[in-house]
């Protein structure tokens, strides 16, 4: 299960794989952080800072729902 949460005041999008859990963050791009479990080393989420600035629309609610296509990695 993938959970999305948008913090409008902070302009931050949080994406969690499964239930949110303890993780460390590693910056993988401009204002994009990969969240890795401190217990298993698995990727457990993604954090996108300054989320609305990535789109022409200032109303982030128009961006949702987001279609996501997932592929199983070999």
What are these regions (language model features)?
Residues 1-74:
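Small, basic N-terminal interaction modules of short regulatory proteins
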């Amino acid at each position: 299960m993938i959970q999305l949460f948008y913090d409008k005041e902070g302009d931050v999008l949080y994406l969690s794989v499964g239930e949110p859990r303890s993780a460390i963050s590693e910056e993988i791009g401009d204002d994009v952080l990969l969240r890795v479990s401190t217990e298993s080393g698995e990727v457990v989420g993604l954090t996108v800072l300054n989320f609305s600035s990535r789109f022409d629309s200032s109303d982030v609610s128009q961006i949702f729902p987001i279609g996501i296509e997932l592929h199983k990695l070999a």
